[in-house]
Amino acid sequence: MLVVQMTEDKAREHSKKRLDRTFRSSAAVKKRMSPRRNDNNVHDKTFRDGSFLKIGWPSVNIMSSSDYRFVALTDYDRFPENIDSEGDGFSLASKRTTTFMSAGMTLVESSPGRDICDSKWRRKSPHEAPPTTGILSLYNRGDRRRWYWSCPHCGEYFQPAMDAMTGYRNEPDPFK
């Protein structure tokens, strides 16, 4: 698996503060780590079963030539829009998973942080994001699935939105 943080410093920090602590603190994980010292460093973690975890940053050297079944891009809107003149992070990352065909997966997470490119844009369909770059642009490239809930009273499905959720506001909080 390849996990790509937004910078080299953040990749190092994530590895040392999160992963290394978890690996040391969990006996179950620790026994699965390779016993050879040179197999595990700040950016590379090797396990006894042969699996490999790479912690990288947006760079063509990191995001080229190696195949990964799973790639995760964190805080995507803080990535450069064009990585080393080779393209956007998602395109480069998803290319790493093509060897695994439908078993490969590219996960991207971020808070939207890019400006909308066309201030006069109007939605043409209910499942459409405005023209922009970053994580919001990936929504339009995907299959645009949304989560729908079943109404407990009539069984009809609806998209959860504040204006569609009625009838609960005057009820006491059952979790207090």
Language-model features: where?
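Phosphate/NTP-binding elements of NTP-utilizing enzymes
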Residues: 1-176
